[in-house]
Swiss-Prot record:
Sequence repeats lie at residues 3-7, 8-12, 47-51, 55-59. This is Keratin-associated protein 3-1. Belongs to the KRTAP type 3 family. It comes from Mus musculus. The gene is Krtap3-1. In the hair cortex, hair keratin intermediate filaments are embedded in an interfilamentous matrix, consisting of hair keratin-associated proteins (KRTAP), which are essential for the formation of a rigid and resistant hair shaft through their extensive disulfide bond cross-linking with abundant cysteine residues of hair keratins. The matrix proteins include the high-sulfur and high-glycine-tyrosine keratins. Interacts with hair keratins.
Length: 98
């Protein structure tokens, strides 16, 4: 049975999916991001390559190719909600306590 099938990673939920880059060869157990341009994905990819050892360690990732190539516009960050919370009583400068 062929181990190194030309498959990389697939995101189980959401529209984003990582595929093999056209300019790179997919080795067994290696996950490659899709080629530019693409949206920022904060989903955890799940490896679909059947060969041992486990292909990729799932981790939150942000594709960085748009940072290196000015030909593509930077993806919008409108979908990422950032909320900060300040504990009450912390407006004054910090004071050491015993």
């Amino acid at each position: 049975m062929a181990c190194c099938v030309a498959r990389c990673c697939s995101v189980p939920t959401g529209p984003a999916t990582t595929i093999c880059s056209s300019d790179k060869s997919c080795r067994c157990g290696v996950c490659l991001p899709s080629t530019c341009p693409h949206e920022i994905s904060l989903l955890q990819p799940t490896c679909c390559d059947p060969c041992p050892p486990p292909c990729c360690q799932p981790e939150v990732y942000v594709p960085t190719c748009w940072l290196l190539n000015s030909c593509h516009p930077t993806p919008g960050l409108s979908g990422i909600n950032l909320t900060t919370y300040v504990q009450p009583g912390c407006e004054s400068p910090c004071e050491p306590c015993c």
